[in-house]
């Protein structure tokens, strides 16, 4: 039934498959930026949190009887840590974007979304396409023009990522400034790749720009990157959270977040709060190695290298695997051009990162097929 489509994917070098990689490979492919996924003492802490409760399963939707004390504790701790009035757990970042876009786009609202916003957000806009306007990536001038052309009486949501997942760029401060100029404008910030990687205390985009006033901000923070767990949380003013709780289909009609993931997120969050400065210093050392060796400066927990073609990308990916390094090989249509995505996970040593950087440098001397992203 799908043979021709699969053949076309093979021919274009776009075919994907699930693969069990050699655990001895150095992991520079995952989003485990702070290296928490290998800390077994934190896993034991998570189990200990669960042991004190009769049930270890969420059982139902949060609006039936699936809401658990661990859920409430995580919401409260995140709201306090990140300086928001209220918080709402969701099953994943994908479900979080679906909840925000499907629910907040009421009849008199428009959404202005960065063209490079995460695929889950772009997918969610298809529900209400007539209420969505895309602007050029990180282009404040293009956004201002589109806002100027929009009806003045509409509620306006502007959706950006703190750190963009496929180019490591940090969204400009101007996106926050513009919502202060427009009375009925609000900012949605997907902090999936910025929490745990930027900011004085690694708290993300809002801390990076020292933004204190959050009454016009809605933050989506995921647990599957720096916090090495699963799930996500929407943080916003209380009224917004109450509205989402009552209207968001991906909150109402889905089982509450796994209690094991919730406990694991709490355990990892507690460790992060205590160790954040040490983690920041360690991440900075990895970033400095990449800059000194390859001349690539990244503010985030990863960097990218752009390739001319899928075969060239896959050749580099294979070469690095042979040298003991696993990196991400990201191909169209996920990105416009093939990218090698290199994550600076702290579970790797500084010596590992030096070796990887030198391996990439040596590869670049014999190949002219990539440039820094």
Curated annotation (Swiss-Prot):
Q: What does this protein do?
A: Catalyzes the decarboxylative condensation of pimeloyl-[acyl-carrier protein] and L-alanine to produce 8-amino-7-oxononanoate (AON), [acyl-carrier protein], and carbon dioxide.
Q: Name one GO biological process term.
A: biotin biosynthetic process
Positions with a binding annotation for pyridoxal 5'-phosphate: 93-94, 165, 190-193, 222-225
Superkingdom of origin: Bacteria
**Catalytic function, reaction form:** 6-carboxyhexanoyl-[ACP] + L-alanine + H(+) = (8S)-8-amino-7-oxononanoate + holo-[ACP] + CO2
* Enzyme Commission identifier(s): 2.3.1.47
Q: Give the record's pathway.
A: Cofactor biosynthesis; biotin biosynthesis
> What does the subunit comment say?
Homodimer.
Where substrate binds, per the record, is at: 16, 118, 334
* Pfam families reported for this sequence: Aminotran_1_2
Q: Which PROSITE patterns match?
A: AA_TRANSFER_CLASS_2
User: Which Cys pairs are S-S linked?
Assistant: none
Question: What is the name listed in the Swiss-Prot or TrEMBL entry for this protein?
Answer: 8-amino-7-oxononanoate synthase
The protein's required cofactor(s) are namely: pyridoxal 5'-phosphate
Could you give a GO molecular-function term held by this entry? 8-amino-7-oxononanoate synthase activity
What's this protein's family per the entry?
Answer: Belongs to the class-II pyridoxal-phosphate-dependent aminotransferase family. BioF subfamily.
Positions carrying N6-(pyridoxal phosphate)lysine: 225
Against SUPFAM superfamilies, the record matches this protein to: PLP-dependent transferases
Q: What keywords appear on the UniProt entry?
A: Acyltransferase, Biotin biosynthesis, Pyridoxal phosphate, Transferase
